[in-house]
């Protein structure tokens, strides 16, 4: 498959057509990772957007966007009495915050779209998780952060559906990647591949990987609002199943990388080197065994589209070059240069 085979090529070259009817949209958030892409696309589609934030972070947003200042922890006065066609909540992972916003807005807005996560399916003990799968509503292990996150998101979903019923919509994205990433997870690969040399390739070539470009997520969320769709949707890409053995060469070609790959498929060895993940790759064992197998069938039928990996990788690399030098010098990558060098040396010594 070619580099653009996992989706539509050149998705950002044509401006989006405007919606048949512009809507009044409220975005809870709007200045993080998803928010700016969401706001830009909504405005380009002809919608009028208001964002509600704490006012602590700046973002390049289109002219005409209304900004309200407040806090999800009870300081919602700026929202009182305001009416919107829909609200998009992309800033909550605590159910008590969602309860406050849904109770305040349930008689002021038409539809409430909540940004959840495929993390609600944790532990990933069965393949092919779709939206009908039961999710945990209570944690069983206080030391398991992944479980706590998934349970919290599931409880947030419940708050939305209890307050809005058929006017509630939930999206469950997998790992979100692309320009503007606030996590420093995926940017590792574009910059590392562009640097060249011997590249540690973690895991088995056959390990499945999933991701969603933040712009594809944002466009789908706006589409759900425009189509007035209820229900829950796994927002997972690419369109078909991909493996790490396909992802790395394709990403490497996208940046014109000249390096070579040294595959380390021994999970025990990687664990000893404290290499457990490098998005979109995660170590597929134990509670993460089927982490990368969520179904996207329902979302695709509802209009979810996918831009090619080449575009995502190139745009992420270009954006990474614009972030502040202090962050680039001390990134929060899951594989650090010294760590990679030590692991490669130890792997070669083990196999000598």
Label each PLM-derived region with a short phrase:
Residues 156-180:
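Conserved beta-loop-beta element that borders a ligand/cofactor-binding pocket
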Residues 48-54:
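Conserved glycine-rich Rossmann-like NAD(P)H-binding loop of the short-chain dehydrogenase/reductase
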């Amino acid at each position: 498959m070619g580099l653009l085979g996992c989706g539509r090529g050149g998705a950002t070259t044509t401006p989006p057509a405007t919606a048949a009817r512009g809507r009044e949209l409220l975005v809870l958030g709007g200045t993080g990772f998803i928010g700016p892409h969401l706001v830009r696309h909504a405005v380009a589609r002809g919608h009028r957007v208001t964002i509600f934030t704490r006012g602590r972070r700046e973002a390049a947003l289109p002219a005409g966007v209304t900004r309200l200042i407040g806090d999800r922890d009870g300081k919602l006065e700026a929202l009182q009495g305001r009416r919107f066609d829909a609200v998009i909540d992309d800033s909550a992972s605590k159910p008590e915050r969602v309860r406050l916003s849904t109770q305040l807005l349930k008689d002021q807005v038409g539809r409430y779209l909540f940004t959840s996560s495929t993390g609600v399916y944790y532990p990933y003990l069965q393949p092919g998780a779709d939206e009908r799968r039961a999710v945990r509503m209570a944690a069983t292990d206080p030391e398991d952060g992944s479980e706590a996150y998934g349970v919290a998101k599931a409880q947030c979903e419940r708050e939305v559906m209890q307050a809005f019923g058929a006017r509630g919509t939930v999206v469950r994205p997998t790992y979100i990647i692309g320009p503007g990433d606030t996590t420093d997870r995926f940017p590792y690969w574009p910059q590392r591949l562009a640097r060249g040399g011997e590249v540690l390739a973690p895991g088995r070539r056959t390990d499945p990987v999933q991701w969603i470009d933040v712009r594809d997520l944002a466009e789908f969320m706006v589409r759900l609002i425009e189509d007035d769709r209820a229900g829950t949707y796994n927002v997972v890409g690419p369109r078909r199943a991909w493996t790490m053995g396909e992802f790395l060469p394709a990403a490497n070609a996208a940046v014109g990388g000249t390096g070579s790959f040294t595959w380390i498929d021994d999970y025990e060895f990687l664990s000893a080197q404290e290499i457990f993940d490098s998005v979109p790759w995660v170590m597929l064992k134990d509670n993460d065994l089927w982490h990368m197998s969520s179904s996207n069938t329902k979302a695709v039928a509802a209009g979810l589209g996918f831009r090619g990996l080449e575009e995502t990788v190139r745009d992420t690399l270009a954006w990474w070059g614009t972030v502040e030098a202090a962050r680039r010098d001390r990134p929060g990558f899951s594989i650090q240069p010294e760590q990679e060098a030590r692991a490669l040396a130890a792997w070669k010594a083990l196999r000598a």
